């Protein structure tokens, strides 16, 4: 039995859960998320907790057991607390500006780079070189943060670019002069 999959998911007060066949919908103070559970796996409610079960020990069932439990657990955390990812911009003249609900980056290109906020995502600019991506869907928050980081990845020689807060960039030694 999967170590992760066998753990029950505790449901805090103020969170509504509806189990409609393979579809799990979770509503909380921050919003609503739904997920369709893969075929052999089933989600059951017992004593104010959610239990993820698998019918057999086939390879696919074992793989999906822990995955499904983690996805449903992330949904519960998302609708109660939410998720956020902080990014930093390093480099002379590199900065970010809020334009309504969207962001506009100056990243050393000849033009500003606009980034629109997808549904369910909110941006917060703390300083011109630091901003936060907020949302209730962990996967979507990470994906948007990764796309923004990909606009100008950290340079291995000078370290310039967009990076996650606390990310350590491996630096390379430049070539030596004559």
Swiss-Prot record:
The keyword rRNA-binding applies. The keyword RNA-binding applies. It comes from the Bacteria. One of its GO terms (molecular function) is rRNA binding. Keywords: Ribonucleoprotein, Ribosomal protein, RNA-binding, rRNA-binding. GO terms for cellular component: cytosolic large ribosomal subunit. It holds the Pfam family Ribosomal_L6. InterPro entries: Ribosomal_uL6-like, Ribosomal_uL6-like_a/b-dom_sf, Ribosomal_uL6_a/b-dom, Ribosomal_uL6_bac-type, Ribosomal_uL6_CS. One of its GO terms (biological process) is cytoplasmic translation. Part of the 50S ribosomal subunit. This protein binds to the 23S rRNA, and is important in its secondary structure. It is located near the subunit interface in the base of the L7/L12 stalk, and near the tRNA binding site of the peptidyltransferase center. NCBIfam families: L6_bact (TIGR03654). Belongs to the universal ribosomal protein uL6 family. This is Large ribosomal subunit protein uL6. It comes from Parafrankia sp. (strain EAN1pec). The lineage of its organism: Bacteria, Bacillati, Actinomycetota, Actinomycetes, Frankiales.
């Amino acid at each position: 039995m999967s170590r992760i999959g066998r753990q029950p998911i505790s449901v805090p007060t103020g969170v509504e859960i509806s189990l409609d066949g393979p579809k799990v919908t979770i509503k909380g103070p921050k919003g609503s998320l739904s997920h369709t559970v893969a075929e052999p796996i089933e989600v059951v409610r017992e004593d104010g907790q959610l239990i993820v079960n698998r019918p057999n020990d086939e390879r696919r069932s074992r793989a999906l057991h822990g995955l499904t439990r983690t996805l449903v657990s992330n949904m519960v955390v998302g609708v109660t607390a939410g998720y956020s990812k902080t990014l930093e911009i390093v480099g002379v003249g590199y900065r970010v500006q809020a334009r309504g609900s969207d962001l506009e980056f100056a990243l050393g290109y000849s033009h500003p780079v606009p980034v629109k906020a997808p549904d369910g995502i909110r941006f917060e600019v703390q300083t011109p070189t630091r901003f936060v991506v907020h949302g209730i869907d962990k996967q979507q928050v990470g994906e948007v943060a990764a796309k923004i980081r990909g606009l100008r990845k950290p340079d291995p020689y000078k370290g310039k670019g967009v990076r996650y807060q606390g990310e350590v960039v491996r630096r390379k030694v430049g070539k030596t002069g004559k």
